[in-house]
Amino acid sequence: MFVELVYDKRNVEGLPGAREIILNELTKRVHQLFPDAQVKVKPMQANALNSDCTKTEKERLHRMLEEMFEEADMWLVAE
């Protein structure tokens, strides 16, 4: 399975290392649900979640992603 998060890079302008921070957090959370998944992030000018998973698995991914960004103030910070 692969999981690719496409995110709007304009939302994290000014945050050094944003791509790596997002990739690390997403990988950690996806691997809790799907340990063998390949995880990628792609900074673009839109938001999307791409995967080759089933509809049920995609629903789980969307819930996880929503929770992840609701908690962004805890992990999406410059170190």
UniProtKB/Swiss-Prot annotation:
PANTHER family named in the record: DNA DAMAGE-INDUCIBLE PROTEIN I-RELATED, VIRULENCE PROTEIN MSGA
Chain's role: Affects survival in macrophages.
Top-level taxon of origin: Bacteria
Pfam family membership, one: DinI
Name of the featured protein: Virulence protein MsgA
Species name: Salmonella typhimurium (strain LT2 / SGSC1412 / ATCC 700720)
Membrane-crossing residue ranges in chain numbering: none
Keyword entries, A-Z: Virulence
Coiled-coil region: none
Entries under InterPro entries matching the protein: DinI-like_sf, DNA_damage-inducible_DinI-like
